[in-house]
Amino acid sequence: MDARKFSTHILDTSVGKAAANVRVTVSLLDEIQEWRSLRAAQTDADGRCLLLEPGQFPSGIYKLTFHVGAYFAERDVKTLYPAIDIIVDCSENQHYHIPLLLNPFGYSTYRGT
């Protein structure tokens, strides 16, 4: 059974709230070591986003690009990071949940559940 799912959750630690309406793109590193774009999605009101579902998610190296520049611009906040790339090795048949803790001048990520 394919248990593979890929999701994220973005929290803006500068205001203590979820980051809604942030565009996230997903790319897969292909056999010739080039990034192949798979999907673009957007976080919901709770800052959550299902990126890939079972059957859409082969093993491999993935790049998540969080397009946070527009999120901060809408709030009239300058940011050092207009986009954040997180590269993840998704080689196991598991659910990969990659949260992003964000503020205008820094970020942190980890593997969640």
PLM features: what roles do these ranges have?
Residues M1-A20, L28:
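Beta-strand-rich domain onsets/edges
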Residues S14, V22, R39-Q42, E53:
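Short hydrophobic alpha-helix segments
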Residues R23-S27, K63-T65:
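Beta-strand signatures of extracellular beta-sandwich domains
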Residues Q33-L50:
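Short, acidic Ser/Thr/Gly-rich low-complexity loop/linker segments typical of extracellular
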Residues F57-Y62:
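A glycine-anchored, Pro-Gly-centered beta-turn/N-cap motif
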Residues K63-T113:
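Feature of secretome-associated and extracellular-like proteins
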